[in-house]
Amino acid sequence: MKKKRKMGFAAAILAMVLLFAGCGQTETKTESSTAASETEDETPVHVLALKGPTSMGMVKMMSDNDSKESPADTFELAAAPDEVSAKLVQGEVDIAAVPANLASVLYNKTNGGVQVLAVNTLGVLYIVEDGDTVQSVADLKGRTIYASGKGATPEYALNYILEKNGLVPGEDVTIEWKSEHAECLAALMAEDNAIAMLPQPFVTTAQTKSDKIQVRLDLTAEWNAIQKDSDAPSQLITGVVVARKAFIEENPEAVSAFMDSYAASVDFVNANIDEAAELVGKYEIVPAAVAQKAIPACNITFIVGGEMKQALSGYLSVLFEQNPKAVGGAMPGDDFYYAE
């Protein structure tokens, strides 16, 4: 499993701002709680997650809570980052799974009132091709990439990877920005050897429409290759889990219990793809058939503590250097990173 839980001090949180694979326009709710026999004093927790890879790791925890006799904790799935932001800032939810840069934006907006608990999703961006001409980043020179997410994290991540490989975006590589992933797919299917940057699970959806579409570059792996010799390597991060700082301070045991349950849920999802995919479909995140193929490529993880801080702060620094507004105008302070 891609779980790295920090206990004590060792290596042991939906933007975009945008979550690259947000799906649907309806909100789904599921309520759950611990049975009264477990403890009468347990604090109910209200959790909100953005639909897509950022919420996929929660599905086992959601299912377990639904099966309890006396539901009290509440899980919601939202279609848009703005909905998550508003409810978190207004105190309507306690914990939320959001795009990584949105967490920093919320931290700045609330004057430090939000903390990140864990990284829950690494990169989900892929270079795909209707052909077989791209084997490395260098092969993108002189080519056109169809992509969506201009002025948001997909653009900044792509620019970073191109530049670190000696390519100048807009000069060595043409990037044709589209408003939606579906437009990228249409362009991809209309040309021979066309190239696009797409997120999971949309990559999987695209491949169901054309068996000619193949993944050529995993941008998470390309980011890691750039960082491999760094003294403090960052990672390409899609989603994190955050909580209101006041809730953390007032309910440390509830937060700790949530973290334990979430870590176990991520474990289950990565180890039991078929069962997890059925749950993803049940909660209408994406269809089960899509989830079954997409989960292994969604980089669902659970990284906390010092490793989380190093990976996330480095990622936010890359965004900040290209556009400070992408992280809320300023890099978050040390108090942004939760530590048990």
Which positions does each model-derived feature cover?
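Conserved C-terminal helix/tail region of periplasmic/extracytoplasmic solute-binding proteins
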Residues: S313-E340
